[in-house]
């Protein structure tokens, strides 16, 4: 039996399952890979957006990564949401120490609803300390413009072998998660970078045709409201009538 080399994902937790470590594990498993994880932050969120964060202490993040890297030794590491400078420092220390074959970075600067996920201090440290270690950056355009706003920096990073892959459909929740996780699986299978990127794009194209089954209470109320309007619009125009129906 062929042994599957695990893929380490270092990122936050999304309680809706649409992004974060949940989306990484689901995508990696769906494509036949095996995911191990280190959690950087826990979000309180639903379909309306993020209500709160709990950032895992840096020493605990470090302990998670060290335990996995020292024992299981994954050759591919995917890095996602990092909100604090001290967390970024322990991630960089571990990546520098263990030097995995591929480091895939999917920046999480804003949520799909536009919530800020990190400060400028973290962004600055990412530019000059994390990017030089990365094999590929998978980003939405607006995040790429922030992370790689310095043309000289981009040339230096690309000179070190880093590639940048930009994704459209910027408002699709968890898009960079799923793409970068798929990319990790294909690289883990021994595919060349160009082939792995193309296969990950094909995977995402199929994913985008699928409608999410996740529906919050606000969507349910909206659908009920539209149904009532269709049924009674010729009879009632008072908004209070429709509010009573809900």
Regions found by a protein language model. Name each.
Residues 135-173, 195, 201-217:
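Conserved phosphate-donor
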Residues 4, 52, 195-246:
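Charged C-terminal helix
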Residues 22, 171-193:
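Short, small-residue alpha-helix embedded
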Residues 1-43, 241-246:
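Glycine-rich phosphate/adenosyl-contacting loop at the front of the ribokinase-like
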Residues 43-51, 111-116:
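A short acidic, helix-capping loop that chelates divalent metal ions and anchors anionic groups
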Residues 31-36, 186-200:
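Phosphate-handling active-site elements
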Residues 52-70:
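Glycine-rich, highly charged phosphate/nucleotide-binding loops
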Residues 76-153:
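Conserved beta-alpha-beta core of the PfkB/ribokinase-like small-molecule kinase fold
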